[in-house]
Amino acid sequence: DQGNNVFDDYNLKLGMGDMGTLSFSGNSSSGSGVDKLKDIVPNAYTPVYEATDATDSGLIDTSGNNQSGQWGYDMSVGDLAISASYNPEPAENKTAESGFALVYSGLMDGLELSAGYFDDGDEAENDTLGVKYTMGAMTAAYQMTKVDYAATGSTDQDATHIGVSVAINDQLSVSAGQQSI
């Protein structure tokens, strides 16, 4: 590359109306599958896990969700949003990765229930459950995530995220959050 390190980022999305959206992710995040539920807890500026160190500990996709070459499919059926991802070859000599996310918003206005799962095809398996409620300018959410790493030397993580944000006006929001791992 003659010393020119270039980051090539490309995505392809095909909108199919009521049949949903099919996507392909080149070298960036796909936004499908568990990526939809990576962090549902509201924040005004920086999520709790970003303020402590460089590692995004306790998030559903931290154990190896490789988004390069990943296919995604998103659609809504009534009050249920469905998102799936599939990566046939995330890396050399690796088995296929798959994940999904479900968000149900039909119980009452402003309430969303979510569930997601990711499997790297080997040993890493992650799951998450969450609830999010929005009323006027206030949003509150609670999310539990379980991260099982494939590597034997890595410590698995059970994380709980909770937060609330209030939009004071169009230019100012205030939030508080906590993460326990």
Where are these predicted regions, by residue range?
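Outer-membrane beta-barrel proteins
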Residues: 1-181
